[in-house]
């Protein structure tokens, strides 16, 4: 069974995801709908780092050159031509590597249905240091109570090449 987890970033970097086997990593630019999908080996943690956040200013007719780099656990490098202010990352994990709790909402849900309904979503404001809520749930109710997840905006000299 495959469980899809979605994360929304606003010009920030994220430093934690539950240990899981990463099958694909899709980078989706909300403005261009451009998708990049990569296969990778199992990794203990997912730690993407984005670099060179320069993009077209909303409402501006002029586009600035932009590029980005994602690095996962110092072993998998992913790059794309342009990452905009709001980036949606879609992570696909195998469920046996994701410790889902026993929850009544899951008792009568088929794996196929759960695959379509289960999600983890992170929403953060653009701030130097902030806490976000991590939650897992179906389209009707959360399965996990919100947990605190720490974020911070990395300085240019902190990004790995």
From Swiss-Prot:
Compartment annotation: Membrane
Segments traversing the membrane: 76-94
UniProt keyword annotations, A-Z = Membrane, Transmembrane, Transmembrane helix
Its record classes its membrane topology as: Single-pass membrane protein
Organism domain of life: Eukaryota
Q: Does the keyword Transmembrane apply?
A: yes
**What GO cellular component term, any one, is given?**
membrane
Q: What else does the entry mention about this protein?
A: Almost completely overlaps SKI8.
Q: What is this protein called?
A: Putative uncharacterized protein YGL214W
Q: Which organism is it from?
A: Saccharomyces cerevisiae (strain ATCC 204508 / S288c)
């Amino acid at each position: 069974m495959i469980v899809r987890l979605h994360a929304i970033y606003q010009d920030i970097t994220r430093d934690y995801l539950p240990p899981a086997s990463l099958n694909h990593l899709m980078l989706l630019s909300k403005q261009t709908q451009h998708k990049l999908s990569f296969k990778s080996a199992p990794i203990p943690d997912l730690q993407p780092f984005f670099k060179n956040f320069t993009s077209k200013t909303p409402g501006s007719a002029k586009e600035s050159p932009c590029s980005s780099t994602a690095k996962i656990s110092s072993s998998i490098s992913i790059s794309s031509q342009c990452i905009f202010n709001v980036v949606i990352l879609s992570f696909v994990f195998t469920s046996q590597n994701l410790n889902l709790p026993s929850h009544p909402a899951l008792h009568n849900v088929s794996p196929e249905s759960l695959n379509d309904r289960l999600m983890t979503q992170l929403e953060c404001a653009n701030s130097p240091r902030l806490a976000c809520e991590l939650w897992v749930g179906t389209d009707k109710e959360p399965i996990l109570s919100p947990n605190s997840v720490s974020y911070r905006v990395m300085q240019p000299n902190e990004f790995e090449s």
